A protein has these predicted regions:
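Metal-dependent phosphoesterase core characteristic of DEDDh/y 3'-5' exonuclease domains
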Residues: 1-19, 38-151, 156-159
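The two-metal-ion catalytic cores of nucleic-acid processing enzymes
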Residues: 240-258
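Generic detection of long, well-ordered alpha-helical segments
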Residues: 26, 30, 54, 132-135, ...
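Metal-dependent phosphoesterase signature
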Residues: 15-32
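A broadly tuned preference for mixed-charge, low-complexity surface segments
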Residues: 21-26, 97-116, 178-203, 258
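Acidic catalytic cores of enzymes that act on phosphate-bearing nucleotides/polynucleotides
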Residues: 158-237, 241, 246
Length: 258
């Protein structure tokens, strides 16, 4: 670590890594990310994690960029890809729940915290948030999912790439798709039937969809009202007005679509 900046005390408490220990056994950031990149960039491999696309991958990208390395290439070059088991696990809960013990939170909804899932299913996890323990736990959860429904597991794995998931999209016929996302909430098992309506005007990796579980009345509203409500948070909308049931899906982030 650099001597001019100390880690947050809460981070030290969670990891058990003090500045003294990091200085004694750690690596400079540039050397550290070089070793990480060498592993992740192995040709024809898939980087898999649990909530990794929204969290771990973003940290890895930033570290690569800060060390003057390509932050994106290892994700898609040389036959490489990435996959995230969080939404895969949500898909299993909604579509194929049998064979897995699903922990329940205080609010009555399923907990998808990795440490809760491993505890409920008798999987050794060691110290939660310890990197190696989390890796082993993620592998064991993947094994459990595949054992419970190999067909669904393999289908979602095959559809992890932008090219594969793009093949499901039919804008001419407005073919509905099943989509799993944290945006839909636990009350809906994080699942919704959506219909793709258009590609994003400036990002060809982003698909614009309408949530068929919500009222389509907004389609009758003037474009100015739609635009105003689309970019207004729920708390700022008038009473009785819900956010528009429009969602974008980033096809290069291994979304769950069926």
């Amino acid at each position: 670590p650099t001597p001019d900046r100390l880690p947050h005390p809460a981070a030290i408490r969670v990891t058990g890594i003090t500045p003294q220990l990091a200085a004694e056994q750690g690596l400079p950031e540039a050397a550290f990310i070089t070793r990480i990149h060498q592993e992740l960039a192995q040709p024809k491999t898939c980087g898999i994690g649990y909530n990794s696309i929204r969290f771990d991958d973003e940290i890895t990208r930033f570290a690569l960029w800060r060390s003057l390395r390509d932050p994106y290439g290892r994700e898609w070059q040389n036959g490489n890809s990435r996959w995230d088991l969080l939404d895969v696990t949500r898909a299993f809960r909604a579509l194929r729940p049998a064979g897995i013990e699903w922990p329940v939170r205080d609010d009555g909804f399923t907990s998808f915290r990795l440490e809760d899932l491993t505890a409920a299913n008798g999987i050794e996890h060691g110290a939660a948030h310890d990197a190696m323990a989390d890796v082993v736990a993620t592998i064991e959860i993947a094994k459990l999912l595949k054992c419970c429904d190999e067909h669904l597991f393999d289908t979602l794995y095959r559809q992890r790439t932008k090219r594969a998931v793009s093949a499901l999209v039919n804008l001419d016929d407005l073919t509905p798709l099943v989509h799993v996302s944290g945006m839909f909430g636990g009350a809906r098992h994080y699942l919704a039937l959506v219909v793709p309506v258009a590609w994003h005007p400036t990002n060809n990796s982003e698909l614009i969809c309408v949530d068929l579980g919500k009222s389509p009345d907004f389609l009758e509203q003037p474009a100015e009202i739609v635009r105003e409500h689309l970019f207004t948070s729920q708390i700022d909308l008038p009473d009785g007005v819900e956010r528009l049931p429009i969602k974008t899906i980033r096809l290069n982030r291994a979304p769950v679509l069926l």
